[in-house]
Amino acid sequence: MKFVKQKIQKLRKKLRHWEYLYYTKNESAVSDEKYDAMLEKLNQLEQIYPHLIAESSPTQRIGGVSQYNFKKIHHKVPMLSLNSIVASFQLLSFDKRIKIKLHANHVMSYCCELKIDGVAVSLLYKEGKLIYAATRGDGKIGEDVTENISTIRAVPMCLKIDSNKYGKLPYLLEIRGEVFISKLCFLELNKITIQQGNKPFSNARNAASGSLRQLDPSVTATRPLSFYCYGISNYCGEKELPDSHWERLQLCENWGLPINNYIRLISGVNKVLEYYSYIKTIRSNLEFNIDGIVIKVNSCAYQSKLGCGSRAPHWALAYKFPSEVSSAKVDNVIFQVGRTGIITPIAYLEPIVISDVTIRKVNMHNINEVKRLGLMIGDTVRIQRSGDVIPKIVEVILSERTDHVKTIELPRFCPVCGSRIKTWRNQSILRCTAGLSCLAQRKATLEHFVSKKAMNIYGMGNKIIDQLVNQGLIFTSSDVFRLNKNKLLCLEGFGLENIERLLRSIEDSKKITLARFIYALGIYGVGETVASNLAIVYKTIENLAAADLQSLSNLKYVGPIIANNIYHFFRNPDNLKNVQDLIDPAIGIQLYVIT
């Protein structure tokens, strides 16, 4: 029993971490298949040992949390997730299961929709006017994004009267839908982002999520966001709604809410399989990204009888598409130095296109991955985009290996600064120990410091930082605040207008929360959540710098490893001097705490 309990705890911990990255950080760490498989494994163990089920388990809840930057909105009707399937026999089992529960012998009708890869939102209308918009959050509490939603043209601020059927507009109407960015608009957005010297978005979903959660609605207004309605969650009007989910969607369209053109009312599970196959064949030609289809029992009366679990409804499923796989030749493997000195092998490929995305390189993460694959330069490999987001080398195609392949030589010295490399974890991880003396670490540290979630200095992208560091204009993060017009005139292709905009952005960044300032320092292991907790507990940066190891270890979200990193960060003379320089009254940074 002890072993089972430990196994369950381990699965929960891993799933929560992945959920945090996906819902809060907008990062897909693993493929949907891997996540769903692990969630199912946990679910099976909890079914066998029901006394070990906890309310906080990923099987019982959704993984997002509302952020402190936004006002919280409580969902009267929870915004649930969907259970996923990947095979036809699972759909047949679903059909059989609901017929048994409903005591139904007839052919079931299903409303089938596209599973658009975007961000779920809830819109509340009263007497036809938009009152508020909220994100999913954890399913019970979301973020108020009304001002940002108001900038999306596809979202009507006022509903139009459906004179043919319902006459007056409903007193209350709560809509559920998806905010997304089309493929073409995403490419254009990234083109503009790169031209501005900023890091491009990794995928359209992340871009949509980040755009929707901007603190400044004027930024959201510049992003090409779209919206489709996929359901009604709450209604109060003179006439009753039709029982058919499909008819309700047609009614939403009559009220001015956009719905997707590929929604179909289908009779029988075999026809649903045909719909799945059809959508799979046209997937690449669609104007937006999808990762499967959604299948809903069409009768809303049946939906009520089938009910919902704590995490997902029992009357709907997401039938996911398998990740696309292609092959490519490995031209080279370069070792890249990150912000903390970790050296990562990057495989450079002959460019290939998977799901409309051109892939030129793949992060191999560590030396063990190179060894596991038995990879050599010149090999042909199979590439998969995990969750249609992260490219990954699945295997080496040994049958295509030639005599011209080369062994990957592991570096003994830092490829950037030449310092000796240290290894740990059975030599699977390589690290340059030169710190800010290493040009790569210095640039990456500065990139992190000025990033949107840190100091948010708009206009200081990677290319600008490269020039500033290469010309010796900045060395530490405090040097950013010593930049002036004369220094910036030295930069190539940087005119007076850009200089003035950057200097304004630097000045604007000086009023910042303590949490974001702590995060900006780049302490190894200190993400946004830990930084926020440290700010609430210690109140000032001076208190945090003076904190002892024991008090740090006792904090929520801070284990012994992160506590040790924080403690030693402030005991490093260079780090301490940089922090003292940053909070020097001459620079004028104003730190405040949000409780």
From Swiss-Prot:
GO annotation terms (biological process): DNA repair; DNA replication
Reaction(s) catalysed by this chain's protein: NAD(+) + (deoxyribonucleotide)n-3'-hydroxyl + 5'-phospho-(deoxyribonucleotide)m = (deoxyribonucleotide)n+m + AMP + beta-nicotinamide D-nucleotide
SUPFAM superfamilies (UniProt xref): DNA ligase/mRNA capping enzyme, catalytic domain, Nucleic acid-binding proteins, RuvA domain 2-like
CDD domains given in the database record: LIGANc
UniProt keyword terms in alphabetical order: DNA damage, DNA repair, DNA replication, Ligase, Magnesium, Manganese, Metal-binding, NAD, Zinc
Cited InterPro entries: DisA/LigA_HHH, DNA_ligase, DNA_ligase_AS, DNAligase_adenylation, DNAligase_N, NA-bd_OB-fold, NAD_DNA_ligase_OB, RuvA_2-like
Catalytic site: 115
EC number(s) from the headed UniProt entry: 6.5.1.2
Any Pfam family the entry gives: HHH_2
First-level EC class: ligase
GO cellular component, one term: cytosol
Binding-site positions, NAD(+): 32-36, 81-82, 113, 136, 178, 296, 320
Record bears the keyword tRNA processing: no
Positions bound to Zn(2+): 414, 417, 432, 438
GO molecular function, one term: metal ion binding
PANTHER family: CHROMOSOME TRANSMISSION FIDELITY FACTOR 18 (PTHR23389), DNA LIGASE (PTHR23389:SF9)
UniProt family annotation: Belongs to the NAD-dependent DNA ligase family. LigA subfamily.
HAMAP family membership: DNA_ligase_A (MF_01588)
NCBIfam families (alphabetical): dnlj, PRK07956.1
Functional note: DNA ligase that catalyzes the formation of phosphodiester linkages between 5'-phosphoryl and 3'-hydroxyl groups in double-stranded DNA using NAD as a coenzyme and as the energy source for the reaction. It is essential for DNA replication and repair of damaged DNA.
Name recorded for this polypeptide: DNA ligase
Provenance organism: Blochmanniella pennsylvanica (strain BPEN)
Lineage, opening ranks: Bacteria, Pseudomonadati, Pseudomonadota, Gammaproteobacteria, Enterobacterales
Gene symbol of the encoding locus: ligA
